[in-house]
Curated annotation (Swiss-Prot):
Keywords: Antimicrobial, Fungicide. It comes from the Eukaryota. Has antifungal activity against F.oxysporum and M.arachidicola. GO terms for biological process: defense response to fungus; killing of cells of another organism. It comes from Pleurotus eryngii. This is Eryngin.
Length: 25
């Protein structure tokens, strides 16, 4: 399986963003 990580910066900060992890394949 391929692990794809999407980093969503909602708080405008690099560290304080929300990370969404999707498993594809």
């Amino acid at each position: 399986a391929t692990r794809v990580v999407y980093c969503n910066r909602r708080s405008g900060s690099v560290v304080g963003g929300d990370d969404t992890v999707y498993y594809e394949g």
